[in-house]
Structure formats: C-alpha cells, structure tokens
C-alpha cells in the first residue's frame, strides 16, 4: 500500500538509527515543566520497537520556534520520555557537533539519546528544496555517524526543513509507526472512503476549512459537510442570512471577508452537500438563547442551536466515514459547549470509521472520556489539513522518492 518504506523493511539490530519525532509540547513558562506529554506517548511505539530490536537510537526533535517563550532545550523532554519508556533517555546538549557525533558513536545496543532542540540551528527554520537541505551541515554531519533515518514526525510533514527532508537523500529511510498510521488513516478517508462520508468542520480557522472543502468536494470523497463555529457564520453570511453587525464585525476583524466570496462559490456549486445551521445559540448578556437563523438578534453567536444538532446528529448516524475538525462553538463555556459535546457523542456512538483533528476537539473528546470510541485522533494539525486539502507533504514525498531510488537497485 505505502509508496515509502516502513520500519518493517529494514533490520535495525546493532545499527545507529536517527529518528525525527515531533514532541513539541506546551511548557509552563515559569517552571519549564511540560504540561502535556501526549505527543511523546504517541511516538513511544516507534521508539520501543527500535529498542526491542537492539538498535542504537538518536532522537532529533524541536520545541517551539525562535522568539517564543517556550523555545527551550530538550532536557525536560528527555526526563519525560525516560518515564514514558521506562528506561534512560540521555539528553545531549548538542545537535550535530563533536559532542553529538561522539555520543552517537559511543551508544550501545538499546541505548536512546535525545539531541538538542534542532531549531537552535539557524538553517533548520529555512524552508528550501530537499536537495539543498541535504547539503546542510546538520544533514551531512549526522549522516556520517548513523546507518538509518526514520521520520515519525507526521505533525511536521508539511515543512520542507533539513531534519525532515534532507536525510532521505543521504540514508536508507523509512516512516515510523505514527507516520505510517496517520498516512494510512488519511488515505482511507480520501482515497478508499466508505460512503456516505460526512465532514464536520467548525472552529475559527476558516482558511483550513475552505481548503479542505475545495478538495473533498472536487474529488467527490465527501457526501455532506456540516458547518459550525465561525465556518458556519461565513457560509450563513455567504448565503444571504443576516447574521447581524456584531457577528459580521468578528469576521471582518479576522480578515475573513475574502472567504465569504469563496464560500458563496462553493455553496452555489455544491449547495446540497454543504449544510449550515437552521438555528444558532446567541450569548445575550451571559445567557444562552437559541434562535432561528432568519431572526438572529445583534448578539454574538456562540454555538449551533438544538434543532441543528438534531439534523447534524442524524447525518452522523447515517455515515460510514466521519472526519471532524474544530469545535461547534465556544465550548470552553459550559452552556455553549452543547453543540460540540452532542456532535462528539454522536460520532462516538456511531458505527462509522471516525477521525478527529485539531487540538481543541481532541481535548474536548479527552475531557468527555470518549477518546477511546474515536477510531483515530490525528496528531497532525497543519499536516493533516494540508493532506486533506490535496497538498503534497514534502517529508512524505522525499520518503517516497527514496524508496523509488532504492527499488531501482533491487
């Protein structure tokens, strides 16, 4: 199925393996303590498997970006990883210099080291062609002391940076278990989708939703798109519904005016497939009031209405495949979390193959205790959106090209 190598294709016993992961995590700015270790747990399967195969594992990762308060070293990450893996993960305060290379050379079978934050290196934040990235100091220096490269960082796969796209041009390379699982799942809902397929798109990132809609409606993978959040407001406005000045101001303040025109084009072309709310919940002086869309007063819309929830829940029950991204409303406030929670409960109780993406929706599912009833919660963020939008992901493309080159000589 895969056009790239997976971990099944190589024997790592006794070999030095460089593993790129994405363990970028929320950090307490005062204590430096990691507040959520979810991403580290997601990569644990790949790392444990390599240790069990007696590989010598060097981890390459980033934390935040230059200028941010949480742009820190990887020292705390090594401690958390040690606890998760139940074995020492040695922090090396170097990326590709003498200390890093010597640490890699001196590893014993089953050892794991975590190199310094790769974004401390200036060239790492530059997005360039893989051939250029393959000649950076980072890639050339580390390639000289390792035998294999594994990319498990699906969440960063949309970035053409040295640590993500350079190594497959220098080393035998494969996708890690998390990368493999993410790609397999997303292919299933785009290429091998079981119908009917329902997309539930909410939240505030209108550009993401518009890009996804353009692709999935054009390729026919989606049967229905259920809109909520600011996404719904844009489509209501595009449909000629008077959402009132306060709600229009929010759209204009966020520079979403251009998306209203895009939404109108999509609605005109695929109208029957794009569902918008029939009622909404407004915040009137701190109180939830449900109103029909043809009678919205000048108060901010904070959620979809109860009638809309019923209609959307029925579409979810009929679906064989479901993808959801973004909350239905201001779910942080209990009285306006009804839309988000009811739709998530409908997804969890359905027999469909279900995928959710986005940190807010994943957090809501976790808080509700239904994460285990969702088939897949994507770690991808921007990479997931790019994939569903039909974009090529540079880190995956170079893995595929590496396999093509290798297969020629077999």
UniProtKB/Swiss-Prot annotation:
Where can this protein be found?
Answer: Cytoplasm
Keywords (A to Z) from UniProt: ATP-binding, Cytoplasm, Glycolysis, Kinase, Nucleotide-binding, Transferase
A single cellular component GO annotation: cytosol
Q: Which Gene3D superfamilies match?
A: Phosphoglycerate kinase, N-terminal domain
A Gene Ontology MF term for this entry?
A: phosphoglycerate kinase activity
Q: Which residues bind substrate?
A: 22-24, 39, 62-65, 119, 159
Reactions this protein catalyses: (2R)-3-phosphoglycerate + ATP = (2R)-3-phospho-glyceroyl phosphate + ADP
Query: InterPro entries annotated for this entry?
Result: Phosphoglycerate_kinase, Phosphoglycerate_kinase_CS, Phosphoglycerate_kinase_N, Phosphoglycerate_kinase_sf
Q: What pathway does the annotation place this protein in?
A: Carbohydrate degradation; glycolysis; pyruvate from D-glyceraldehyde 3-phosphate: step 2/5
Question: So what EC number does this one have?
Answer: 2.7.2.3
Q: Where is ATP bound in this sequence?
A: 332, 358-361
* Broad EC category: transferase
The record's Gene Ontology biological-process terms are:
gluconeogenesis; glycolytic process
- Similarity comment text for this entry: Belongs to the phosphoglycerate kinase family.
Record note on quaternary structure: Homodimer.
The protein here is known as Phosphoglycerate kinase
Q: Which organism is it from?
A: Methanothermus fervidus (strain ATCC 43054 / DSM 2088 / JCM 10308 / V24 S)
